[in-house]
Amino acid sequence: MADPEKQGPAESRAEDEVMEGAQGGEDAATGDSAAAPAAEEPQAPAENAPKPKKDFMESLPNSVKCRVLALKKLQKRCDKIEAKFDKEFQALEKKYNDIYKPLLAKIQELTGEMEGCAWTLEGEDDEDDEEEDDEEEEEEEEAAAGATGGPNFAKK
């Protein structure tokens, strides 16, 4: 099982009681077990306290310890690769940021100005001219309909 030197006092007592019961000690012959009341009693807070990490690792079997160490080494290798990736990714972002700067400056120049654009789209001029002509005609009709006084004052 486990080494008696590494066991705590509570563990060694429990093991001794189990061994006595298996060997047919006094309690087993009388039918009244001292282990039963001990199992019903709540454990002391010190026994319920979590073990420190070092003690926990020491309590594991060697095969599990080897796996844990191997996983730690693999995780370190993954961390190194990820750090290298992040470094190269930042360098690549910087490179393309420098390439995009002139284009972004032109976009800012075009969108940031309040003046009209010097470039025109095809067909845009025709639509603007038609809209202006329609507006002028409407204004003339409104003026003629409600005009009082003017060149045609005396209509006969």
UniProtKB/Swiss-Prot annotation:
Q: Which residues form a coiled coil?
A: 68-94
Q: Which GO terms describe its cellular component?
A: nucleus
Q: Low complexity bias: where?
A: 34-49
Where is the protein localized? Answer: Nucleus
Sorted alphabetically, which keywords does the UniProt record give? Answer: Coiled coil, Nucleus
Q: Main site of residence? A: nucleus
Q: Which InterPro entries match?
A: NAP-like_sf, NAP_family
Compositionally biased intervals (Basic and acidic residues): 1-16
Its Gene Ontology biological processes?
Answer: nucleosome assembly
Gene3D superfamilies per the record? 1.20.5.1500
Bias class Acidic residues marks the residues at: 122-143
Residues of the region (Disordered) are 1-58, 120-156
Membership in a protein family: Belongs to the nucleosome assembly protein (NAP) family.
* Name of the protein described by the UniProt record: Nucleosome assembly protein 1-like 5
